[in-house]
Design a protein with these regions (language model features):
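Alpha-helical subdomain
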Residues: 1-64, 69-70, 156, 161, ...
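Conserved Class I S-adenosyl-L-methionine-dependent methyltransferase catalytic core
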Residues: 6-28, 32-38, 46-47, 53-160
């Protein structure tokens, strides 16, 4: 008789139940309602405006997963929920969960098709303004950690102007310019994203030092006269050939000595670790036909496009910074 069990299969297959329970609890505002004090089931149901029976289902599922604690007849946030999902701290991952629930999760229904056809099946669907805001705010939320780590781990004192290509709503530029007051920044993004970025940066103290330019990385002229160029969460959108083309385009716009700073979910050479990076390859495939890459592959792009690899700097979790210098 074998000791092998199907536990791994069952636990993995149940992953969609765990994520949808978490997404629903977040959208209902469960963790916000428990941010200030523990609540009974009836109090929770009343505050959420849902029946007591369904309030019990969602709350007990969150207890089972470790997001809530239950003592006697009262529910309270666990430390992780209070920190990241209650809205009471700057480390707010609620927008990220909304992004995965409303934008990413529906796309994953097409994973098998994407695997069979070797192309994204959702990337051509245009986001409406509300979806674009959910997308942009969600990406900014999950990138907040590595974005704030970057100016602490990479020294920008040698630079004067930073160009963030595909810069979202400024999640990387803002902490960099805040930490290094000598810098000026340019955010280059697609037109729908720049509208969200303008709103996000309007009241930010570093906003006046950021020039927002709308354009396409491959179709429009890239801004010139920058000596640091950021590609954060960009290369996973494209295949090898397209990434080499992008790096060549950037190299043509800068002088020798300028640096390109590529932030992404880099994997080991086998593309099997870290776990999150290996899994998120499916996210990029289904959405835009993209992929995750290894540090070695980035070095190969550099050799072929006029850059010299300098170093890799871990930022946070599975996200690292790969640095190249124009030669």
């Amino acid at each position: 008789m074998t000791d092998t069990t199907p536990d791994l299969i069952l636990q993995t297959a149940a992953g969609f139940m765990m994520s949808k329970h978490l997404f629903a609890a977040n959208d209902l505002g469960l963790f916000e309602k428990l941010a200030d004090r523990p609540l009974t089931l009836d109090e929770l149901a009343n505050d959420l405006s849902i029946p007591s029976r369904t309030a019990r289902i969602t709350a007990d599922a969150m207890v089972a997963l470790g997001f809530l604690e239950k003592q006697d007849d009262r529910y309270r946030n666990s430390s992780v929920s209070q920190t990241f999902l209650s809205g009471k701290t700057p480390a707010d991952l609620r927008p990220f969960l909304r992004f995965w629930n409303h934008i990413s999760y529906p796309q994953w229904q097409h994973l098998e098709e994407a695997l069979r056809t070797n192309r994204g099946v959702s990337g051509d669907v245009e986001l409406d303004p509300d979806q674009q805001r959910i997308f942009s705010e969600g990406v900014a939320a999950i990138q907040a950690g590595p974005a704030h780590a970057m100016p602490e781990k990479y020294d920008f004192t040698r630079h004067r102007k930073v160009l963030d290509l595909g810069g979202g709503v400024g999640e990387y530029l803002v902490p960099i310019l805040d930490r290094f007051p000598q810098l000026e920044g340019t955010l280059f993004e697609l037109p729908p994203v720049t509208e969200v970025a303008r709103d996000a940066l309007a009241a930010n103290p570093v906003g006046p030092r950021i020039n927002i330019v709308a354009g396409d990385l491959f179709e429009d002229a890239l801004p010139e006269d920058h000596d640091a160029l950021i590609l954060a969460n960009v290369v996973h959108y494209f295949d090898h050939a397209r990434n080499r083309e992008l790096l060549r385009r950037i190299r043509e716009r800068v002088l020798a000595g300028a640096r390109v700073l590529i932030v992404d979910f880099w994997t080991n050479p086998q593309h099997t670790e870290p776990l999150f990076a290996a899994l998120v390859a499916g996210e990029f495939l289904t959405s835009v036909g993209g992929d995750v890459y290894s540090e070695e592959e980035a070095k190969g792009w550099f050799r072929e496009t006029g850059w010299e690899y300098l170093q890799t700097i871990p930022l946070e979790g599975p996200i690292s910074l790969v640095v190249g210098e124009a030669i």
